[in-house]
Amino acid sequence: MIFDVKAPILGFETIHKMRLQKIDEIFLRLNSTEENSVVSFTLVNPFALRKYEFEVPTPLKILLELEGAKSVLVANIMVVQTPIELSTVNYLAPLIFNLDKQLMGQVVLDSNKYPHYHLRENILSHTHE
């Protein structure tokens, strides 16, 4: 599914369309669709790994048309390492997808409001919760 990027991923502000592909129940792949840009992210379903909740800021709710949306997906960027146990997840800057309208964006959470989320957390750090 191809999404219009309404709130850019930090560092990738020139990318306006991205393709999301489900790998399995936990992992997804996000790729740029622009010919002059080869950007690819591995995403992870945070709810499969830990308790995870946050408030979406009102401006992002408006940009992504989340009010009344029936299908919303939250995913986090993962840095894959070998072995997989060394991989890290960015819980402080989740991606939000409005599947109904094919809109997406990244929200950067306030680390003071969410001190239990970090930019680089080991993928296994919450598996025993």
Curated annotation (Swiss-Prot):
InterPro entries membership: Flagellar_assembly_factor_FliW, Flagellar_assmbl_FliW_dom_sf
Record's subcellular location: Cytoplasm
GO cellular component terms, A-Z: cytoplasm
Gene3D superfamilies documented for this protein: BH3618-like
Alphabetic keyword roster: Bacterial flagellum biogenesis, Chaperone, Cytoplasm, Translation regulation
Pfam families: FliW
UniProt xrefs under SUPFAM superfamilies: BH3618-like (SSF141457)
Top-rank taxon, per record: Bacteria
Annotated family: Belongs to the FliW family.
Function of the protein: Acts as an anti-CsrA protein, binds CsrA and prevents it from repressing translation of its target genes, one of which is flagellin. Binds to flagellin and participates in the assembly of the flagellum.
Subunit composition and interactions: Interacts with translational regulator CsrA and flagellin(s).
Name of the molecule in the record: Flagellar assembly factor FliW 2
Native source organism of the sequence: Helicobacter pylori (strain ATCC 700392 / 26695)
